[in-house]
Amino acid sequence: MRQIPFRTGFGYDVHRLSDGYELWLGGIKIPYEQGLEGHSDADVLLHAVCDALLGAAALGDIGVHFPPTDMAFKGIDSKILLERTCQLIREAGYEIGNIDATVAAEAPKLNPHIPEMRRVMAEVMGIPISAISLKATTSERMGFVGHREGMAAYATALIAYASALE
């Protein structure tokens, strides 16, 4: 059976905001009075991107490859998880086309940080910065995001069989 060379994936992640944690989003530290709780550095954006990539390649999800029960990943920098995810994608015979992601957070304002997040993500992923679109939104003070209890991120990824691009 013939397979179409392009595949899309979707990723979603949430983490609780808490005192005593640093806020890491898109691979950068963002000044804020709270951070996100998690087994790793809780970078909700990079986790959603990892899930989108893994989903596009039908390789499971971030919990399969980097389980929260494994102490090797305790406190790990999520840029390492993203780098390893990109390696898995390429080892499976794919190239990454683009990423489109949105972070939902009531505060802090994220738009000033988006250019640096894109730069860092492009460097880690080995793709052009033009292949990464990031947006930030609020939830209009509704739900757990709106009540400043946590943050959420949504991501899509496009990948293609490397052989189809030759």
Report each predicted region and the residues it spans.
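C-terminal edge-of-domain segments
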Residues: 145-164
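Pyridoxal 5′-phosphate
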Residues: 134-138
